[in-house]
Amino acid sequence: MLSSTIIAALLAIGSALGSNGYGNTIDSRFDKLSDLTDKYTLYQVISQPDAVPAEATDNLVPSQPDAEPVEASLSSSESPAQEYSVKERCERYTMKNQGLEREYNLYRPEGLKAGAPLVIVLHGYGGSALKGKKAMMDVADKNGFAVCYPQGIKDPKGKPGWNVRYPSQEGMKTDDVKFLIALSKELQKRFDLSPKNTFLTGMSNGGDIIYLIAMRAPKAFKAMASIAGLQFNWMETEYSYKHPLPFMEVHGTQDHTSEWLGDPENKGGWGAYIPVPAAVSRIIAVNGCTEEYVTELPRREGRNQVTLYQFKAGRPAVKGGRPTEVWLYKVEGGDHSWSDKDMDTCSEIWRFFSQWID
């Protein structure tokens, strides 16, 4: 039970050993969770009775922030432009959805086998599919999967993105959750890609909508990875997490566009949202994870320290499947980016996704 195992471990100084995927043993003492933030532990879940099973929220205490978050910038940035090159390597396609012609770019490594896995990569707000993450194609070359970079629809201010009800998106009728599900089916059928092994990742606005999909359509993708994504308050007013799913989040503690500690008063202008640890805690709870491992990734010279929190032994997402996991990469001092100067982010995403391939 989550309440008896994890909460007790938070109060005790017990430890266990496990593998972190780097060939090392790691200490799984839960007292390290206090390092996540000085205001929120990962298991301090703000009350939402219908969102998670009752046994997953026993004894969890609502957090009370005692300080205002730093005002967020309205600008959204990604990694340097020279790291992005999709146009030269991808094929461009269109499809009809909700009365609109939608664009996407598809990369298939040479010699890709029929029924290969698929990873869909979502750009940030104001971004472009043609400036998608080049490194994911490099990982695809080594591991044999297809990569799709869809293009977001422009909002009334002319900024492309995914509809998560930013103030600038007011009046938009596009349902991007439905579009992304339809896109995955289009790709699977048209290009003979695996319906069982289709994954979703995205950065910033692309990560935001992943939280919404995790609530509305948790079975639509085999696993999901959000980079600098947010769970907005309105999402859990209308929806909740009701089904286990493998989930990963990468987030910098000095991200002043998507604040680690949240923005409950909407000072940043994107809409009110909860702290990142609180958002991830909801997904841990619905997964029913009972084991936790903490490790520091090898630190690159002159770069930020990355700590990986792995939550395991959850409820299987499919009957007879393996227990789910939730991974949180905390980038100490990290900004609003893919954090790929601090770690090999795309390889880490695939390392997580590849565990769930049938």
Predicted features along the sequence, with ranges:
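Catalytic active-site module of serine/aspartate enzymes centered on a nucleophile-bearing elbow/loop
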Residues: 344-358
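Alpha/beta-hydrolase active-site loop
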Residues: 169-191, 212
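Cap/lid segment of the alpha/beta-hydrolase catalytic domain
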Residues: 151-175
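A domain-start/cap signature at the N-terminus of enzymes
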Residues: 5, 13-53, 57-60, 64-69, ...
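Accessory cap/linker subdomain of secreted extracellular hydrolases
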Residues: 253-293
